[in-house]
Each structure stands twice: as C-alpha cells, then as structure tokens.
C-alpha cells in the first residue's frame, strides 16, 4: 500500500510543480482614498486600466476588460482581466515608436470605501480618478402651449 502511494505521489508531483510555474502572475494595487469633510456622495471614484506599450503617434486603446468584485477573509477586492487586442487609428506618423500608456476601454465607477484593492495581471496598471461635485445645475423649465 505504501509503495502504491509513493508511486502515485511521484507521478503527480511533476505535474503540480509544472502547473505552479504556468500560473498567471498578478499584481495587487491598493489605493488609499483621500480623507474629506465633504459627504461621500460628493465624490465619484473611477478606475481605469492601462499598459505601457511601444506605439506610434496614432490614437489607440485596448479592447475588452472585465472587473469582478470578490470577497475573501481580508475584505472586498476587485479582480481585473483583460486581453491584448489593440484598436488604433491608421494615420501616417513621422516619428518612430515611443513607449506610452494605452488605456483599456473599460472604466468603472467604484464605491468610495477605502482602501480599494485591485488585482491586475502582470504588466497592467490601474489608476483611480477622483471626480468632485462642484455644483448642481438645475434645468430651466419651459412652459409649452398645447395645440
């Protein structure tokens, strides 16, 4: 019985080690939101994802992307997954290629609960854009005549 278990362990161990090497690498991004005396509904927090890519002068963005809310023992976090499919304009460029940020088309508004934890694939960055409500614009009410 012991020999059978050792044989099974010897057969399974290389596959377990091989699977660990091919697991996708991720980065954890933790954002501490600024403290304010204003109520939380005065702010919107938008998350945007990007990659640093060698690209010419054309406008470009990455297609797709998916943001999932998950929960573990440490609390709520978000997990982003996105592809490498690039969309861009097709104009002629004089300059060569330069390394610059290319954003995914996906952006999403998140609740203002600090800290915000986002897991991204290796090489994908995340940033939080903070929007503040400056004033509320009321609509003009026009009286219409019924015909």
Residue ranges and their predicted role:
Residues 44-108:
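Mature extracytoplasmic domains of secretory-pathway proteins
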């Amino acid at each position: 019985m012991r020999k059978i278990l050792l044989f099974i362990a010897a057969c399974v161990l290389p596959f377990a080690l091989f699977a660990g090497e091919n697991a996708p690498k991720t980065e954890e991004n933790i954002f501490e939101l600024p403290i304010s005396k204003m109520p939380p509904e005065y702010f919107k927090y938008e998350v945007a994802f990007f990659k640093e890519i060698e690209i010419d002068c054309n406008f470009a963005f990455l297609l797709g992307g998916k943001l999932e809310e998950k929960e573990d023992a440490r609390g709520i976090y978000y997990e982003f997954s996105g592809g490498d499919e690039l969309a861009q304009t097709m104009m002629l460029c004089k300059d060569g290629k330069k390394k610059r940020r290319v954003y995914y088309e996906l952006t999403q508004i998140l609740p203002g609960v600090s800290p915000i934890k986002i897991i991204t694939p290796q090489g994908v960055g995340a940033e939080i854009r903070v929007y503040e409500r400056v004033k509320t614009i009321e609509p003009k009410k026009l009286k219409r005549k019924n015909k």
